[in-house]
Amino acid sequence: ANTDKLMHETSNHLVEAGGKRMRPVLTLLCSHLGDSKKYEVIQAATVIELTHLGTLYHDDVMDEADLRRGVPTAHSIWGNNTAILTGDVLFARASQVVSGLGQRALLMQAQTFERLVLGQLHETVGNEDNDELEFYIQVLKDKTGSLIALAAQLGALLSDAEESYLEPLGEFGEAVGVAFQLMDDVIDIQSDDDDSGKFPGTDLRAQVPTLPVILLRKKTDAASVELLELIDAGLVSDADLQKAVAQLRSHPVMEESIAAAVEWAEKAKRSLGPLPQGSVKKALEAFADAVVERRG
């Protein structure tokens, strides 16, 4: 293990802040489709969480976020350069662990990492020629769904579960990832400060694309057009932000966004068809439901 004092402090910052750990939990859950006692399963779960943590350090720099998991972000404490390098070290550590899990696991992790980065790139550069909603969903599949899909697949692969389970688990994870992010969009508007670890409307003010705003752009009534003009003006003042959040909370696009998240969770559950009936399948279905029932 690397004993560099600063890196130890910075890389443990978000670990100690908590979090849901939903990705490694999914790896452990899917391992019960095979021999869940294999040590490689624990290593796979570690790879998933290290990769996820690395992306958080980079995401927070790109989003200029002040809070993560209710604590100050790494870059707000140590600066952008240190935060970026901390993310790099976490990716390096994930690569070290996955290198011991065989060629296939290594390739799957590398392919997922590429998708993850491209998803982030496409979100950053923005949409040019594609339908805005289609583009957004594809970004979510790549940026979030890909790693959740890998989490499920590695659990099955490294527990020597049936080969035929890997494809449906990949589809499940990707759909759950989309549902998760769509609920995040809703939570950004609906949450109280202490529920989600960030202030309501954080993404809204940062002009980060979210489903409610994408759906709002399709509306033509006067109230929707006026609200969109307010949002597009930048929400510089707290009063404007609070006004936009209040209007969005009561707007039909919120219910439409929740319905979309629920539909992706249902799609995730439908993808589990090839899996055997039993406790693992039931737990995966409950996992998909929990993603859209959360409020923080």
Show which residues each predicted segment covers.
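Juxtamembrane/interfacial segments around transmembrane helices
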Residues: I137-V139, A260, R295-G296
